[in-house]
Amino acid sequence: MIAPQRMLMPEGRPPAGLTTGLLIFLTFLFGISQLYEDFKNHFVLTPNSLFDIDLGKLSLYPLMHLSYLHLVFNALAIVGPLNNFESSHGTIHTGVVLNLSAVIAGIIYCVVSRLLSLETGVAGASGWVFTFITYLCVKESQLYPRLELSRFIPGVTQSIPTQFTPVVFLLFTAIVFFQSSFLGHTAGMIVGYIMGYGETWFNILIPPAWIIEKIEEKADPLINLIPFGIKFYRSTEINTDDGYRSFFPGQEVLPTTTPGNVLGTA
């Protein structure tokens, strides 16, 4: 069976600062949207947002949720993968990746929607969920090319290619949550594959480590205000030689830094 503690608290480390703060912020924004109905309109990404130069929505749309269940499901789904990513890449680095992944997925959504003459708007962090789950599955596939379904469903002996697990998750989500945005989820998944397989390309878009370290130095007074029990992962604390560690129990480490570096550390 999957080990939730591996994802929620990798190697026993405390909850990550950005992940924890993001969950609080998502809840806060949802609360405001319940008080002011028009508030959510400033976040919802429509197919015309890109072409109307309404660029703020390209990065803001994952922050707004349209219902309580929408918020709860996305919060539960994002906390594990994002906490895992942040603890192995650094807090500021993860913030940059969150923004970049939202923008790239948003552009994909707007362009494809325009080509298909779609007019439906999207909002919510589910695109991020697919991005980070896909990234983890790509890395997991380097340890185990096939995923045994018995880890999730006792008695089932079938297996599927690990790197294609997000596709199965995408189809499952489309069936169970039939009102969700299939295109939005697909765009998020595509970004996850880009991150997993195209790290060299993605590195170009991420500030080098020395810039992130400078930002951390300037933000040090604020970092020190983070409550006890929640950790801000500094770039200098990230060991790029550790490689990827499986979130399944009792599995060994496979270095993922040969050749090159951990995503965004070049």
Swiss-Prot record:
Query: Is this entry keyworded Transmembrane helix?
Result: yes
Q: Where in the cell is it found?
A: Golgi apparatus membrane; Golgi apparatus, cis-Golgi network membrane
Question: InterPro entries of this UniProt entry?
Answer: Peptidase_S54_rhomboid_dom, Rhomboid-like_sf
One GO process term, biological-process aspect: proteolysis
**Membrane topology field:** Multi-pass membrane protein
The question of whether Kinase is a record keyword is answered with no
Q: Where is the active site?
A: 126, 185
Give the protein's recorded name. Rhomboid-type serine protease 2
Gene symbol?
RBD2
